[in-house]
């Protein structure tokens, strides 16, 4: 280890540290009211979480990731057990039962499950390189769907959505055929479109079509799924009997429709009305002007008010007059943009870009396939959180409850982010 300690990534660590300090500053700012009085002490907890998170980062970095590889199945299984426990015995926070607690202490298992999932998926994709691509794709899909389903039961749509890009990117790097990945993408796209289309007609156009009635009626949806499934089975039989290529593509196409219908049916059962509304409110904030639409409008006002240089630290109006809800968590970038302006936003952007580049460099330097896949999975987590959260506060992405890692208030998200960075740094340390 000593001879490889020269591989310690100071730029990555300093970028993480800088973002964490900025996060504490603006969590403090969010707790100050219009009279300049500190009314919330969340920043003190965040300082403790940052300090303990840094300790976790170094402990994980110093532990040999190759040893973790052998226990990845156990780590994944423990994560699933915690996810199973949470919906029945967990705490309900903001409509989702995603916390388990002991007294005043609580953690969010779904945040740590992302790490367990990446470790196990990387382990499987590394060990299965001699298997057929279809078998690898199906098994990797099952590994992904199980935690996604358990997280949706909480229900926590934002965290569940993170698994899709991780799965697609890691499978692509592992050499899974593009047509299989295109299948997943199209199923997700059509499934989500099938969920949103009726909501769009109901809240925006005020005209409900026959298609929307079918998609929102469970009986009709199940009937339509049965029709698609029967047609898929017939085309599949035709392919095996006649070995014609067009039967293969017809089977592929109708299988996509079957998958999309399953997402629509499951979405109607699992997602609550306020979550469905959040998925379309960014297109027209007036749909839900007093809830999700209010958040988006106030966030954009705060960002616009900051201008180039901002209103100065602790001088923002949207935050200190409490116009902006969820200030220290989902919308912390709005406070930062108001008080530090465009320049402050660019500083944060630069720090995140540095993190992305350093993780990518660690992946490229890695000599073993398992470590490379783990680094890539971690990079996807950070990029997805960054893009969705920034898009959300700017009104160009749906409100999904995705925190801005290292900045947003919260111990579980911060600790999981620190552990993820620790894993990447540990992989980088052990390269020759």
What are these regions (language model features)?
Residues 13-29, 33-291, 334-394, 419, ...:
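Hydrophobic alpha-helical transmembrane segments of multi-pass inner membrane proteins, especially
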Residues 4-6, 136-137, 321-324, 366-367:
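Helix-boundary and loop/linker segments of multi-pass membrane transporters
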Residues 1-15:
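Flexible extramembrane loops and terminal tails that flank transmembrane helices
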Residues 6, 20, 299:
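A short, flexible N-terminal coil/short beta segment enriched in small residues
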Residues 281-332, 340-344:
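TM-adjacent membrane-interface loops and short helices in multi-pass inner/ER membrane proteins
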Residues 156-161, 311-316, 327-329, 400, ...:
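Transmembrane helix boundary and interhelical junction motifs in multipass membrane proteins
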Residues 1, 388-432:
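A juxtamembrane structural motif centered on a specific transmembrane helix
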Residues 103, 320, 405:
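Short pre-catalytic strand/loop immediately N-terminal to key active-site residues, enriched for Gly-Thr
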């Amino acid at each position: 280890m000593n001879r490889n300690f020269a591989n310690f990534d100071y730029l990555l660590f300093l970028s993480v540290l800088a973002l964490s300090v900025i996060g504490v500053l603006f969590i403090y700012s969010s707790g100050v009211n219009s009279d300049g009085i500190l009314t919330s002490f969340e920043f003190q907890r965040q300082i403790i979480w940052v300090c303990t998170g840094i300790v976790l980062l170094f402990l994980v970095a110093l532990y040999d990731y190759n040893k973790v590889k052998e226990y990845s199945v156990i780590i994944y299984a423990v994560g699933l057990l915690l996810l199973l426990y949470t919906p029945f015995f967990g705490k309900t926070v903001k409509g989702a039962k995603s916390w388990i607690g002991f007294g005043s202490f609580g953690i969010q298992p779904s945040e740590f499950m992302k790490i367990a999932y990446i470790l196990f998926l990387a382990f499987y994709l590394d060990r299965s390189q001699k298997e057929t691509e279809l078998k690898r794709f199906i098994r990797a899909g099952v590994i992904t769907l199980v935690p996604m389903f358990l997280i949706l039961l909480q229900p926590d749509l934002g965290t569940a959505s993170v698994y899709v890009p991780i799965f697609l990117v890691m499978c692509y790097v592992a050499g899974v055929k593009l047509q299989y990945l295109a299948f997943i993408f199209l199923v997700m796209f059509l499934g989500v479109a099938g969920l949103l289309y009726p909501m769009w007609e109901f809240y925006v156009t005020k005209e409900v079509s026959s298609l929307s009635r079918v998609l929102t009626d469970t009986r009709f949806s199940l009937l339509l799924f049965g029709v698609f499934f029967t047609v898929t089975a017939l085309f599949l039989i035709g392919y095996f009997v006649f070995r014609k290529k067009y039967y293969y593509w017809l089977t592929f196409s109708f299988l996509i429709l079957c998958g999309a219908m399953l997402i629509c049916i499951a979405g109607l059962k699992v997602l609550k009305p306020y979550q469905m509304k959040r998925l379309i409110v960014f297109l027209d904030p007036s749909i839900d002007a007093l809830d999700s639409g209010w958040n988006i409008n106030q966030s954009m006002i705060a960002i616009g008010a900051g201008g180039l240089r901002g209103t100065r630290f602790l001088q923002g109006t949207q935050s200190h007059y409490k116009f902006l809800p969820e200030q220290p968590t989902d919308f912390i970038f709005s406070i930062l943009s108001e008080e530090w302006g465009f320049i402050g936003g660019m500083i944060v952007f630069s720090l995140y870009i540095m993190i992305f580049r350093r993780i990518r460099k660690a992946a490229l330097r890695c000599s073993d396939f398992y470590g490379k896949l783990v680094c890539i999975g971690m990079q996807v987590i950070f990029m997805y959180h960054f893009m969705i959260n920034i898009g959300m506060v700017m009104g160009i992405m749906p409100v999904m409850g995705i925190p801005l890692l290292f900045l947003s208030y919260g111990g579980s998200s911060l600790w999981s982010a620190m552990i993820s960075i620790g894993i990447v740094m540990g992989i980088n340390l052990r390269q020759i």
